[in-house]
Amino acid sequence: MNIYLDVDGVLLNHDGTLANHADEFLAAMVNSGHPVHWLTTRCRDGDSSAVVAVLSRLVQPSTVELLTSIKPTSWAASKLEAIDLRSPFIWFDDQPLQFEIEELQECGLLDRWVKVDLLSEPDQLSALRMFGEL
């Protein structure tokens, strides 16, 4: 199973601070044994250095090394371009574009998207760590 992670609104709050339980969530995902990929506008050209630099300033020192093990993705107009829809996956994102949601629905894959809503559930990442055990 591939794991895809957005950054803004998932690991970072809307004010740019680190989300509650982000370190533990990242550790659970990276240590799950599943491939983990950045799927964020901060990393859409196959280069994850910008996202790693931003998060490295905010996470615990023990988490910094985990950040570099997450694979970058490449995509242009839609994050779905970077997802292998034929393979099992889980996608953590706060707000996919409407056409991305519609495409997932048409493919019968909408349940693979996990909506992260840190505004209404600031501790949501604590509960979502269990996806690393799938």
Feature-to-residue mapping (PLM):
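Alpha-helical substrate-recognition element adjacent to the catalytic core
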Residues: 1-77
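C-terminal cap/substrate-recognition subdomain and adjoining C-terminal extension
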Residues: 52-134
